[in-house]
Each structure stands twice: as C-alpha cells, then as structure tokens.
Amino acid sequence: MKKMKKVFALGLGVLMSLCLLSAGAGAAERPLAITYVKSPLNIPSILEKRLGLLEAEFGPLGYSVSHPEITSGAQQSQAMAAGSVQVANCIGGTSLLIAAAQGLDIRIAGIYSRSPRSFCLVVKDPAIRSVADLEGKKVAGPKGTVLHQLLLAGLKREGMEASRVEHIEMGIPAAVAALMSGSIDGALAAGPLALKALEGGARVLFNGEGLVEGTIVIGVSGAALRERDDLAKRMIDVHRRALAYAEEHPEETVKIVGEETGLSTEQVLEMEKLYDFDPTVRSEDIAELERTMHFLVDEGLATRFVDPASLLVR
C-alpha cells in the first residue's frame, strides 16, 4: 500500500510539473510582433534587434518577440488590423493618422524620429533652379505620405497651385531611378536613396526644413495595450536604452548600422546628423501631427479629422 502511495505521489508530482511546464510554454508563446524598419537610418530599431533589447524586455513577461520587416506604413496598419502585428515600431505620422481615421484601434506610444532635412525633392535638369520652374513638370513619389505633404507645402510656400505640377504615384526607389533615367523631372526621396540620387548628379531643390518635420511615431495596438497596459512605456524604455548604447558606443553603433544598411561609415556619420530620435512627445510634435491631419482631410486621404492628442498613450 505504501509503495502504491509513493508511486501515486510520484506520478502526481510529474503530472503537476508537466502542467506547470505546459503553462509556462503557453505563456512564452504569446506573440508580440514588433515591426522592423531599418531604412533610411533607423538606429534605435537596428540596435534593438541586433542587441536583443526587445527580447530582454518582453521575454521574461512571457512574450515571444518577432520582427516582421514591413516597411510600408499602410501595410503595417493592415497587419495590425489583422492582428498579426502588435507594435508598429516605425510608422509615419501620415500612415498612422490615416489608419486611425479609418477606425483602426491604434495609439501613439511616442515619437520614433524627426528628420525634416532627410525628406527632399531632388532634380537633375540644370534648367530647374526654383519651384517656379516645376510648372508643367513631372514629379514622382508616394502619395499620402510625408513626402507628398512636403511637395504640396513646398509649392504652397512659393504660391504655386498643386495642379500646375503633375504628381505621379511611385515608390521612392522607382522615382529615383526614373529621375536618373530622365523620364521625370523631380523625385521625392529620403535617406540613402536621396543620397544615391545626389551621388548620381541630382541636387536638392528643397527639403522639409520649415515645411514638414518628417515625424515618425511608435504605434501600438489598442488590443495589445488592453492586454498589457505598460506596453507603450516599455517600448519607450527600450528605445531609450538603444539611444544610450549608441551614445556610449558610437564606433560600434556605426559599424552595426553600416552592416545592416550597407552604408559606408562616412554615409552613416553624415546621415545621423539629420535625425532626432528623442521619443518624448513635445507640444510641437502634436502641432505637426495636427497639420498633417488637416492635410490628409483636405486632400481627401482621410475621411474625418482625428485629434492626434487623443491617440497618445498617457
């Protein structure tokens, strides 16, 4: 009888251990998909992935972190709507606001970056010396984006109506290629692709300075926030840790970023001057996002006005 009790107790212990392991495995399998966008020069994301900072933050909480490479803001929003992405770790303010206006339950955890000078309109024809020379010309670039907003703001500043320029919908790589081949007159570009155009003989007609801030944000799913209300805060904490690493290890950071982006040391050092990665949401950021929201409504890209301040995770 005692032997049977021992066997029973042993069996019960094994069963309980298996149950605990099963429960632990189940918790560890909770997915947390955080988009990975390394270009044009997203230093925080590159360091977060390479150094395993997100895994270190969320792994102990029972999350299995993945890094889907979805670079399009619209596609990040679609993935979040489908439930396959919980954090859009680098999404344009334009894309997030369009998605929010369409009813997506998405919130702003903080600012990812500001980089007005990295967004620009590049031209190659020597005859195009000013915005006035763009009349009747073809300019290519993605619509419903910061670059689209930049084009309209640049034209408006010089008193030119948007209808006097032919804006062709085109991705940045295709737009730069079309400019270099001579099939269009101007390309809306940013980051390494703008640099590539300049190295190929193009020049900047104007950039976002004084026109748009190029605000990129960290978007989090409302559903994910309800599951874990400190998700946004933890994302910002990791972002700050990546920035601290970059400050403490500048040479290693440049090396890592160069390996991830294919940029030379000189290119990384030149481009990083254009970015402000401070995640703190300032009053100027809210004002910029409000201007962006008005732009989207005026252009028919958003069906309703959404107050950006209402999307902030407090």
Predicted regions and their residues:
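Extracytoplasmic "Venus flytrap"
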Residues: P31-R50, R282
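Pocket-flanking alpha-helical
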Residues: P44-E48, P68-D105, R117-V131, L147-H148, ...
